[in-house]
A protein has these predicted regions:
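Glycine-rich, acidic/polar active-site loops that bind/position phosphate-bearing ligands
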Residues: 1-206
């Protein structure tokens, strides 16, 4: 929240990757009334009515965000049927404002279609279906201009030292998603690595 912000600069760039499920009648959109759809695999970045549902909502959301001058940079279908992600890029405080407005617009547009938006980290419980997170990309001038392995590792070590404090600020029920499975690290552990999808922090290839 704004009252926690002491100083922040447009030098700080944030790229948010917000995952979510679309729900209708208490189930993920497109799921059968009983049981589950076929296993995940074809849904991720999928096309075609057998692989994705809700694209009209996604497209209307993207257009509305662009019209509102929100820095939306993309969307994609996620690993479960009815699960999607949108990406927002912003600088400084505006990044957070854009994220919240993008969420609000998404909920409103889904409402027009009789669909609800579920941001719970693990809405399907402890099943073999991925949950929904929000990976956050970050950089500052030093990282963009002269980023190095030493710099990245130094920053990761600093974050690791306050891992438990940080987790407390990230919302409730993350323990249900951060189990060490489904491309996550355990909530009580911290790790980082290059292109490591199971780490707390994934560092791009240098």
């Amino acid at each position: 929240t704004r009252n926690k912000i002491k100083s922040i600069s447009d030098e700080w760039w944030f790229g948010f990757e917000q995952e979510y499920f679309m729900y209708k009648d208490g189930r993920p959109l497109g799921w059968p009334e009983s049981g589950e759809p076929r296993e995940q695999g074809d849904y991720y970045c999928g096309v075609g009515c057998d692989n994705v549902v809700g694209r009209e909502i996604v497209d209307r959301h993207t257009e509305a965000c662009m019209n509102a001058e929100i820095g939306i940079t993309g969307t994609n279908a996620e690993v479960a049927l009815g699960q999607w992600e949108f990406q927002v890029l912003g600088k400084g405080v505006k990044a957070g404002d854009d994220l919240w407005m993008a969420r609000y617009i998404l909920v409103k547009i889904a409402e027009w279609h009789g669909v609800s938006i579920n941001l719970h980290p693990k809405p399907l419980g402890q099943t073999d279906w991925n949950g929904s997170g929000m990976h956050t990309n970050f950089s500052n001038n030093k990282m963009r201009d002269s980023g190095s392995e030493v710099l990245m590792e130094h920053m990761c070590e600093k974050l690791g030292a306050v891992h438990s404090e940080g987790i407390k600020e990230y919302g409730s029920d993350n323990d249900q998603r951060l189990t060490g499975l489904h491309e996550t690290q355990s909530i009580d552990q911290f790790s980082y690595g290059v292109s490591d999808r199971g780490a707390s922090i994934r560092i791009p290839i240098y």
